[in-house]
């Protein structure tokens, strides 16, 4: 096979379609040798097919489990540290106490010690539970009592606090004594009145606590309080102080007549510095006023959590929980009495039936608080005397449990306060507590810094920590054992992504000064100006660009076109009028970091000095990577000699986020060999060319392109895996790339190891309009402006926003939701976005959809109460009207609205969940770029004498739109549901269209061939347009016209019809490109070929050992133990172990009472848990399973999807050791495919009326095709599916609905292919008939079938007749 050929590829995350074509667009066929023990020694195959595989999955689920395991381990370690401190003293009191606690979960017969865990006897145990119904009763008693307590009780209380220690979101101290809102409000008023004696505030009669702690938005609370104070305004000084206390961001500029804004926000890291700046301007006499506002803020925050008076108790949290317990008891007593009196018939159902969502189901069953409230509310509404209970229910405060989702809101400082109080009380009686007080408190407060990471020893791929010594790490020796600096450096290296252009170089931080200079110059380089006396617009010179950066960008955070005209061209160049092009109203790029650092360092010369570039870059890197102030301080110490304490303090508080896409080496490191200039040098000054970044790296006259290509060359073999692993992209993308490369390698081998002329890859990417900008921020802004205007909201006036800020997801969602919570009818606070949760409407457990369409912004506590499905019906009822308003204003899409309201329609169905899997295919868009680069570097490895790459193989990348249009224009329609041939057909059509285009328009190689970027003006080759249009837009029009040479006639915009020749040639060489008579017939023939090589990749299963649900104890040998030595019959366990692969075993087993040995041949599933012991010694493993005289050489490993052939070509794939799947593909002639497509798209056909009429006429004239298609399905089903009952149902339903419209019949027939499709059987609907799946739950028939081992393309195969194995 020495003819020229090309390869077409259609790449997805679940499939790779492939085809080989000749110069005449034919698919060659070839005879292949068949290995094995069958009579078949050769087979003729067409070189077209598709590889199917299970898509690669992210490590997210594994990571979540790993982090949960770490969390539980660390919690257990905390308890061990506490027990260690208590052990000696506890041994004197009760030496088996810790042993009894350790055994408390075990059933009685497994316990080695007394069964009563606390006191070891029933009398004391009962007395304890009567005295302390909850752990919080014990905690409060110990905090408030001065009496000596039993050491065991002290341990229990401390252990509870250390085990459930609260969150670490609030830094520093949090004083529970500051929780008296009224008292601290009066203190604020008094402090204010001392300063402003002439205009005092009269706050008598104001119920500050009720107003400031109300469950309303902060702004509403502010308004309500100011309304109680005559003469005060919400933006006056006192109003702004209250706003500050509430967590808002007031501006004190007008209060103190300042020249600049003076905004303060307590939750900001920079609050202390911002306050210092303000006090420096207004005087220190106001310091106490701001301190009083801060104390009031702490009180408001805590009052939301703690609902008891801290003067009565030093245990506010425990007291609040006891109050909750007591109220629960009182409300339950009342509820029981009311039900007994008024609805006695309901009493049993509510209080005893755990299967219902009543009180019994709520306490002992699985009913959530929300479900219980939904159940009990109508019952309460029917009865008299329930008013108070209903008020509590509506406030979500009725019959609350001790452990609820909002316990997550308790800061660790509250637990620490109670722990400290207990130690203080009891250390007089137990001196060891005094000696170890700091150690015990450290157990509660210690957290491993995130930049140190997991504390694993050895070669864990997840850990990067560096040790100073090999000691065991504890909270008390952490600083001595762990090298925090070295660990932080490793953290940096792990966290930073690689530059896609130079794969070994790390990208710069987004706020790097160098990166910002690069973006500014890259934008300036395409700016043109024209003024009087100039014939045409000119680019800016190098001197002009430098002057503009110094004059405008270094003095303004944002630079506008108006400033460019007025402050530069008018004042410096003295142009009275000038027109600017290449930039809209303002520049996107800015020197934001320069301005930040200038404000802090206040030394312009230092910032402008190039010798300080490394220092400044390192500072920005530190401020981007680390949140931990201690580590920032440690890393910035290096520069302490350069800056004073004030500057260091301000630098430490500065935070940056985000990463750029390019490395320092790419921007300002690699140099053009001839000129010695870097890319940044060219952007600053490039003569008349004024090339931007993309032009510079693709210009053949410069050496950047060559340097980048060399850096990207991927090797062969093992390094291929490594190279693909290092690419940016999801695991699904990477798996698709690896399979594609393997397919291409095998096809080159099949073709005699000489390389193809072309490899054509479908590149799915949407057209973009350059003028609109590649960023979507402007489109986001436009969407918000139009939607908010439609709603009539004032939100954009109250909180203006710039389009670049809308890249922040939470901020974008805030505006899309008009500043309101999506699940509860409450306002959200724009200043507290970090406290809120972004929630997935369809949970990630069902669909990893991270689009804005699947996200809402909601308060954390409400979000936690939501079920693991779509938002509940109760939420839908409350919020649907509001969601409809957002839908009407186009702030949410119809899809988002449908998902939000799905609970009305029964929540997520199995069909939905199946659809979610298909939707993941969106990831295919980035995949082909990576494949093109890898294939190009693997195929083209030779260089000429000038060290220029010789491109032997052209890797052509196609937009999916081209082939899609080709199919529709020439009626090569695709119906995906029929079979998997469409992957192969797409690959074939990619090859046809790609090679024809290159033949017809060789000058356009730069548009299609990877790595070829010759400078041809695309716009000259398309229909001329009067106006100048952007390049991406030009591409779109170009692509819509480029396909015209395939047509026999084209219709121009004015309606004129032009004929085209039947034989298209290349204008310069005269070579025939497309013979319309011959080549369309060839394409039609290929698309009708019945023999297409469809291969399902066999895969050994990995992952979890079994299903995760813990099943209750029962007498079953099938349950897997939860822990070692835990009998599932006592403790329950897991079921459904995951089978890694199956094995064919030929051996003997004992049968009957006489235990006579009998020969067997059977499949055995090897679970993931068993895999290592099986592979270590297969014979020992199988003998332990009861097999004797195992024939080792006949053991065959059979991964999932192993293929077997039975009678009449019927095929089955292995699903597991006990189940099979369908293994054949129904090859439907293309005339039927076209008919089904047209019939099912009857009312949606796009095209001219005449064209559509013709298609509809074709459908009407070929109604009889319906019968023929059903006949094909029926014959195929009888031969290979063997589901007679299902087929009878289908034929009966078909005859019943024969008179239905053709479109309806065609749509339903398309559903029928679920019956015939390759793979796992599935249920489907045919009209109103549900056809259940026919499962193949026995694997016995394949034991004597032919096992087919296929290569990745399916062209090479080995056939093993299993019936010939294992005879006596």
Swiss-Prot record:
This is CRISPR-associated endonuclease Cas9/Csn1. Monomer. Binds crRNA and tracrRNA. Mn(2+) 1 binds at residues 10, 762, 766. GO terms for biological process: defense response to virus; maintenance of CRISPR repeat elements. NCBIfam families: cas_Csn1. Residues 718-765 are annotated as: RuvC-II. Belongs to the CRISPR-associated protein Cas9 family. Subtype II-A subfamily. The active site is at 10 (for ruvc-like nuclease domain), 840 (proton acceptor for hnh nuclease domain). Changing residue 983 to A: Only cleaves 1 DNA strand, probably the noncomplementary strand. GO terms for molecular function: 3'-5' exonuclease activity; DNA binding; DNA endonuclease activity; metal ion binding; RNA binding. Signal peptide: none annotated. Residues 56-718 are annotated as: Recognition lobe. Its EC number is 3.1.-.-. Endonuclease activity on target dsDNA requires Mg(2+). The RuvC-like nuclease domain should have 2 divalent cations, while the HNH domain should have 1. Crystals are often soaked in MgCl(2) or MnCl(2+). Its cofactor is Mg(2+). Changing residue 982 to A: Decreased DNA cleavage. In vivo, loss of Cas9-mediated CRISPR interference in plasmid transformation. The keyword Nucleotide-binding does not apply. Residues 925-1102 are annotated as: RuvC-III. Changing residue 10 to A: Target DNA noncomplementary to the crRNA is not cleaved; nickase activity. Processes guide RNAs. In vivo, loss of Cas9-mediated CRISPR interference in plasmid transformation. Able to bind guide RNAs and target DNA but not cleave DNA. PROSITE patterns: HNH_CAS9 (PS51749).
């Amino acid at each position: 096979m020495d003819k020229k050929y090309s390869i077409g590829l259609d790449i997805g995350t679940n499939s790779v379609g492939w085809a080989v074509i000749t110069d005449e667009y034919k698919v060659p066929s070839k005879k292949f040798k068949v290995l094995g023990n069958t009579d078949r020694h050769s087979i003729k195959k067409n070189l077209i097919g598709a590889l199917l595989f299970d898509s690669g999955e992210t490590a997210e689920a594994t990571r979540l489990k790993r982090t949960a395991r770490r969390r539980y381990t660390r919690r257990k370690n905390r308890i061990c540290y506490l027990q260690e401190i208590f052990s000696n003293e506890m041994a004197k009191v009760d030496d088996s106490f810790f042993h009894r606690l350790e055994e408390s979960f075990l059933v009685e017969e497994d316990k080695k010690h007394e069964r009563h865990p606390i006191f070891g006897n029933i009398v004391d145990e009962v007395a304890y539970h009567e005295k302390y119904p909850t752990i919080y009763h014990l905690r409060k008693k110990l905090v408030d009592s001065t009496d000596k307590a039993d050491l065991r009780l002290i341990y229990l209380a401390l252990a509870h606090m250390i085990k459930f220690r609260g969150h670490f979101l609030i830094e520093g101290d949090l004083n529970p004594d500051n929780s008296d809102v009224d008292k601290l409000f009066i203190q604020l008023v008094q402090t204010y009145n001392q300063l402003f004696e002439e205009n005092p505030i009269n706050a008598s009669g104001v119920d500050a606590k009720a107003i400031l702690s109300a469950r309303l938005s902060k702004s509403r609370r502010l308004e309500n309080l100011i309304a109680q104070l005559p003469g005060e305004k919400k933006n006056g000084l006192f109003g702004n102080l209250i706003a500050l206390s509430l967590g808002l961001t007031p501006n004190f500029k007008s209060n103190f007549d300042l020249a600049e804004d003076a905004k303060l926000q307590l939750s900001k890291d920079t609050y202390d510095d911002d306050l210092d700046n303000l006090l420096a301007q207004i005087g220190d006499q106001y310091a106490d006023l701001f301190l009083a506002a801060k104390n009031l803020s702490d009180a408001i925050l805590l009052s939301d959590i703690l609902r008891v008076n801290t003067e009565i108790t030093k245990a506010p949290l425990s007291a609040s929980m006891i109050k909750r317990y007591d109220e629960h008891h009182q409300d339950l007593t009342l509820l029981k009495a009311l039900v007994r009196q008024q609805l006695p018939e309901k009493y049993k159902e509510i209080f005893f039936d755990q299967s219902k969502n009543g009180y019994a189901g709520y306490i002992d069953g699985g009913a959530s608080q929300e479900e219980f409230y939904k159940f009990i509310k109508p019952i309460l509404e029917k009865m008299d005397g329930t008013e108070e209970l209903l008020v509590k229910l509506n406030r979500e405060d009725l019959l609350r449990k001790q452990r609820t989702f909002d316990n997550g809101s308790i800061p660790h400082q509250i637990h620490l306060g109670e722990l400290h109080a207990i130690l203080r009380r009891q250390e007089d009686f137990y001196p060891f507590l005094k000696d170890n007080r700091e150690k015990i408190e450290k157990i509660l407060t210690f957290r491993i810094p995130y930049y140190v990471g997991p504390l694993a020893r050895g070669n864990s791929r997840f850990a990067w920590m560096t040790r100073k010594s090999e000691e065991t790490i504890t909270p008390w020796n952490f600083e001595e054992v762990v090298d925090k600096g070295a660990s932080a450096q490793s953290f940096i290296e792990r966290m930073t992504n690689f530059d896609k252009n130079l794969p070994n170089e790390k990208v710069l931080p987004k706020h790097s000064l160098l990166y910002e200079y690069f973006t500014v110059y890259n934008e300036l380089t395409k700016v043109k100006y024209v003024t009087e006396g100039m014939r045409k617009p000119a680019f800016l010179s190098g001197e002009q660009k430098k002057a503009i950066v110094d004059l405008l960008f270094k003095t303004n955070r944002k630079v506008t076109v108006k400033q460019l005209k007025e402050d530069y061209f008018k004042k410096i160049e003295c142009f009275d009028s000038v027109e600017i092009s290449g930039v809209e109203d303002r520049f996107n790029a800015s020197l934001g970091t320069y301005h930040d650092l200038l404000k802090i360092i206040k030394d312009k010369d230092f910032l402008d000095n190039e010798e300080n570039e490394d220092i400044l870059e390192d500072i920005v890197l530190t401020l981007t990577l680390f949140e931990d102030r201690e580590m920032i301080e440690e890393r910035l110490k290096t520069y302490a000699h350069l800056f004073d304490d004030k500057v260091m303090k301000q630098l430490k508080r500065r935070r940056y986020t985000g990463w750029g896409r390019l490395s320092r080496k790419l921007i300002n490191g690699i140099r053009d060999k001839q000129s010695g200039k870097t890319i940044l040098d060219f952007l600053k000054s490039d003569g008349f060319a004024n090339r931007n970044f993309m032009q510079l790296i693709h210009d053949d006259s410069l050496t950047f392109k060559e340097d980048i290509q060399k850096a990207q060359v991927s090797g062969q073999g093992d390094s291929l895996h490594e190279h693909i692993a290092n690419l940016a992209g999801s695991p699904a993308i990477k798996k698709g790339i690896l399979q594609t490369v393997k397919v291409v390698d095998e096809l080159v081998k099949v073709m005699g190891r000489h390389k193809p002329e072309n490899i054509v890859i479908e590149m799915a990417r949407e057209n973009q309009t350059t003028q609109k900008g590649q960023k979507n921020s402007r489109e986001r802004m436009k969407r918000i402006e139009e939607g908010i205007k439609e709603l009539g909201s004032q939100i954009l006036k109250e909180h203006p926003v710039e389009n670049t800020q809308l890249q922040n997801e939470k901020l974008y969602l805030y505006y899309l939701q008009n500043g309101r919570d999506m699940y509860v009818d409450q306002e959200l606070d724009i200043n507290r976005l970090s406290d809120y949760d972004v929630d997935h409407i369809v949970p990630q457990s069902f669909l990893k959809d991270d689009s804005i369409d699947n996200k809402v912004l909601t308060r954390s506590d409400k979000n936690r109460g939501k079920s693991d499905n779509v938002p509940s019906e109760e939420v839908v009822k409350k919020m649907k009207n509001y969601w409809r308003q957002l839908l009407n204003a186009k702030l949410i899409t119809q899809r988002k609205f449908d998902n939000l309201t799905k609970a009305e329609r029964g929540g997520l169905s199995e069909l939905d969940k199946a659809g979610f899997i298909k939707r993941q295919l969106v990831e295919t868009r980035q995949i082909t770029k990576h494949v093109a680069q890898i294939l190009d570097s693997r195929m083209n490895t030779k260089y000429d004498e000038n060290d220029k790459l010789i491109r032997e193989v052209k890797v052509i990348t196609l937009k999916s739109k081209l082939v899609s249009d080709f199919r529709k224009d020439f009626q090569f329609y695709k119906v995906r549901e029929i079979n998997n041939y469409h992957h192969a057909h797409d690959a074939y059509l990619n090859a046809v269209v790609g090679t024809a285009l290159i033949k017809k328009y060789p000058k356009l190689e730069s548009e299609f061939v990877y790595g070829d970027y010759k400078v041809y003006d695309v716009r000259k080759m398309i229909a001329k347009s009067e106006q100048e249009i952007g390049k991406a837009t030009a591409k779109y029009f170009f692509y819509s016209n480029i396909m015209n040479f395939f047509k026999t006639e084209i219709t121009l915009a004015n309606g004129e019809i032009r004929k085209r020749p039947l034989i298209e040639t290349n204008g310069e060489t005269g070579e025939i490109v497309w013979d319309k008579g011959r080549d369309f017939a060839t394409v039609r023939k290929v698309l009708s070929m019945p023999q297409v090589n469809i291969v399902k990749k066999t895969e050994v299963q990995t992952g979890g050992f079994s299903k995760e649900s813990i099943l209750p104890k029962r007498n079953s040998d099938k349950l897997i133990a939860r822990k070692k030595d835990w009998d599932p019959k006592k403790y329950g366990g897991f079921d459904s172990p995951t089978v890694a692969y199956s094995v064919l075993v030929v051996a003997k087993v004992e049968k009957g009472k006489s235990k006579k040995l009998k020969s067997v041949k059977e499949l055995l599933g090897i679970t993931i848990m068993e895999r290592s012991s099986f592979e270590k010694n297969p014979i020992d493993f199988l003998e332990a399973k009861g097999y004797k005289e195992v024939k080792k050489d006949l053991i065959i490993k059979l991964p999932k999807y192993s293929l077997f052939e039975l009678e009449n070509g019927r095929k089955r794939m292995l699903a597991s050791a006990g189940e099979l799947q369908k293994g054949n593909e129904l090859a439907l002639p293309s005339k039927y495919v076209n008919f089904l497509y047209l019939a099912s798209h009857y009312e949606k056909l796009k095209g001219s009326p005449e064209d559509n009429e013709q298609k509809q006429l074709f459908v009407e004239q070929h109604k009889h095709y319906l019968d023929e298609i059903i006949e094909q399905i029926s014959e195929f089903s009888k031969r290979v599916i063997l589901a007679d009952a299902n087929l009878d149902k289908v034929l009966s339903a078909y005859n019943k609905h024969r008179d239905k419209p053709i479109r309806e019949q065609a749509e339903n027939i398309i559903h029928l292919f679920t019956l015939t499709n390759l793979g796992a059987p599935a249920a489907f609907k045919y009209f109103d008939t549900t056809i259940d799946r026919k499962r193949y739950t026995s694997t016995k028939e394949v034991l004597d079938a032919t096992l087919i081992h296929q290569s990745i393309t399916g062209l090479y195969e080995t056939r093993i007749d299993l019936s010939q194995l294992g005879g006596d």
